């Protein structure tokens, strides 16, 4: 016990010397992470032998010390690789070589020169998100070499170039679907404002300017067919054709809007597609009309045979009915009941899904009846993150989202089968009355960056 405390105090003194020296060389940062690794190994050994406190320092659980030791080992290997590169002699501080800085986007890369930018969603000055971009990014290649590149920002996000590949590490379109409603945003970089790319809505006439319009699809990509190559990211998911986002017009008009030579073949293809769509819709209309004529023919034939059957009976009564006639009458009777709405409905309507808040009892004798009852299970949302972050988020949301969330759980964690040590991050469950409430909550929620979420449901709350 005394030996462990003495070694632990020695490691603490070494860390204090490193913090007070303020050296900015890479070797000092490697020594810092080596000392942290030894400290976590010592704490792990103490907890494994039943020691709960070293001096005034409580010993953390085994899973915590093990994970921190692995993080320290990974940082040492990463810094040693950077030290062997051409950038090993540059000044490096504790903040630049911290685990949080390395794991921030772009992950597992070193960054210098932070800069804060703001993105305004939906043109609302109150709906503003702040992002941190970097002027210089050091990334590791597959050959264990390091490259230093400059960071950039445009309307779609923050990016850097890996050779000739444009790599985005912040995407504004993902946050626009979470925080916004219209899918339009503005990027404020220092005193400059980056708007949506200008898209042409009509060809230029004469020497006058062309009419332009800011349009944006729900995915965050500009809906344009003519954009400069420098303003469109290289990712295929960020480009979309203009004709899929606007109302269909006549093929002749489309062909006139295309440039001569280049757009002519494209206009012919659109004209062919337009004719195919008209033929398919016309065929469906003919089929529906034919079905109506067949149904009318069956009903008229049934009406015509009724007087004949009555004349065959005695005393004006109904004559003998054949098996085919009884089947047709039962089918027509069921159709009339379904059309009139008097037949009993079997199943669970969309409005009833998620309305049950109690477990299904034993009174359901049959698999179908039980499945229909279980279809009303209440929907849930599971949040994963730091315990304090989840508690603060719950405190804020209980004031803002009144009427959407039925219950908030306390923070909890999983434990292993063989021990009571906590596994992974903390959890918190949100329960809703209906799936519509949960979907509305998802559209308006603003989760912290370190919190993940998933969906599910249970049979009882």
From Swiss-Prot:
One of the Pfam families matching this protein, by short name: PPV_E2_C
InterPro entries for the chain: E2/EBNA1_C_sf (IPR035975), Nucleotide-bd_a/b_plait_sf (IPR012677), Papillomavirus_E2_C (IPR000427), PPV_E2_N (IPR001866), Reg_prot_E2 (IPR033668), Regulatory_protein_E2_N (IPR036050), Regulatory_protein_E2_N_1 (IPR042503), Regulatory_protein_E2_N_2 (IPR042504)
Compartments where located: Host nucleus
Start and end residues of each stretch annotated as DNA-binding domain: 377-461
The UniProt record lists the keyword Coiled coil: no
Subunit-level organization: Binds DNA as homodimer. Interacts with protein E1; this interaction greatly increases E1 DNA-binding activity. Interacts with protein L1; this interaction enhances E2-dependent replication and transcription activation. Interacts with protein L2; this interaction inhibits E2 transcriptional activity but not DNA replication function E2. Interacts with protein E7; this interaction inhibits E7 oncogenic activity. Interacts with host TAF1; this interaction modulates E2-dependent transcriptional regulation. Interacts with host BRD4; this interaction mediates E2 transcriptional activation function.
Ranges of compositional bias, category Basic residues: 326-338
Family of this protein: Belongs to the papillomaviridae E2 protein family.
Main location: host cell
Region of interest (Transactivation domain), residue spans: 1-201
Role of this protein: Plays a role in the initiation of viral DNA replication. A dimer of E2 interacts with a dimer of E1 in order to improve specificity of E1 DNA binding activity. Once the complex recognizes and binds DNA at specific sites, the E2 dimer is removed from DNA. E2 also regulates viral transcription through binding to the E2RE response element (5'-ACCNNNNNNGGT-3') present in multiple copies in the regulatory regions of the viral genome. Activates or represses transcription depending on E2RE's position with regards to proximal promoter elements including the TATA-box.
Residue stretches of biased makeup (Polar residues): 217-239
Composition skew (Low complexity), residue ranges: 339-349
UniProt name for this protein: Regulatory protein E2
PTM notes: Phosphorylated.
One GO cellular component term: host cell nucleus
Covalent S-S links between cysteines: none
UniProt source species: Human papillomavirus 9
UniProt-annotated stretches for the region Disordered: 197-364
SUPFAM superfamilies: E2 regulatory, transactivation domain (SSF51332), Viral DNA-binding domain (SSF54957)
Molecular function GO labels: DNA binding; DNA-binding transcription factor activity; nucleotide binding
GO biological process, one term: DNA-templated transcription
Key words, A-Z: Activator, DNA replication, DNA-binding, Early protein, Host nucleus, Phosphoprotein, Repressor, Transcription, Transcription regulation
């Amino acid at each position: 016990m005394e030996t462990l405390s003495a070694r632990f105090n020695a490691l603490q003194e070494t860390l204090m010397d490193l913090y007070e020296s303020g050296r900015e060389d890479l070797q000092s940062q490697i020594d810092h992470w080596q000392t942290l690794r030894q400290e976590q190994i010592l704490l792990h050994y103490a907890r494994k032998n039943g020691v709960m406190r070293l001096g005034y320092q409580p010993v953390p659980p085994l899973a915590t010390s093990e994970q921190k030791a692995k993080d320290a080992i990974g940082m040492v290997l990463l810094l040693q690789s950077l030290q062997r590169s051409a950038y090993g002699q540059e000044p490096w501080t504790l903040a630049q070589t911290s685990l949080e800085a390395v794991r921030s986007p772009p992950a597992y890369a070193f960054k210098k020169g932070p800069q804060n930018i703001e993105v305004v969603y939906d043109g609302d000055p109150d709906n503003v998100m702040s992002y941190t971009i970097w002027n210089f990014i050091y990334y590791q290649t597959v050959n264990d070499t390091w490259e230093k590149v400059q960071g950039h920002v445009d309307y779609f996000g923050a990016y850097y170039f890996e050779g000739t590949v444009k790599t985005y590490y912040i995407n504004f379109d993902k946050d626009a679907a979470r925080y916004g409603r219209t899918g339009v945003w503005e990027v404020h970089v220092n005193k400059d404002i980056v708007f949506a790319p200008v898209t042409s809505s009509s060809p230029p006439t004469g020497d006058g300017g062309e009419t332009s319009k800011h349009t944006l699809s729900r995915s965050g990509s500009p809906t344009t067919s003519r954009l400069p190559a420098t303003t469109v990211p290289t990712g295929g998911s960020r480009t979309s054709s203009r004709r899929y986002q606007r109302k269909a017009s006549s093929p002749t008009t489309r062909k006139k809007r295309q440039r001569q030579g280049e757009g002519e073949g494209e206009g012919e293809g659109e004209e062919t597609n337009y004719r195919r769509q008209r033929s398919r819709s016309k065929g469906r209309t003919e089929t529906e009309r034919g079905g109506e004529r067949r149904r009318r023919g069956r009903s008229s034939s049934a009406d015509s045979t009724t007087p004949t059957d009555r004349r065959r009976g005695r005393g004006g009564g109904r004559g003998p009915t054949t098996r085919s006639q009884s089947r047709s009458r039962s089918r027509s009777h069921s159709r009339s009941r379904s059309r009139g709405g008097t037949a009993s409905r079997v199943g669970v309507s969309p409005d009833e899904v998620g309305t049950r808040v109690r477990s299904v009892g034993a009174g359901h004798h049959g698999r179908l009846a039980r499945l229909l009852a279980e279809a009303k299970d209440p929907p849930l949302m599971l949040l994963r993150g730091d315990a304090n972050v989840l508690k603060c988020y719950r405190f804020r949301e209980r004031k803002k989202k009144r009427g959407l969330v039925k219950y908030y759980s306390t923070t909890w964690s999983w434990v292993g089968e063989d021990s009571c040590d906590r596994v992974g991050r903390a959890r918190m469950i949100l329960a809703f009355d209906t799936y519509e409430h949960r979907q509305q909550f998802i559209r308006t929620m603003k989760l912290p960056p370190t919190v993940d979420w998933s969906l599910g449901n249970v049979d009882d709350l």
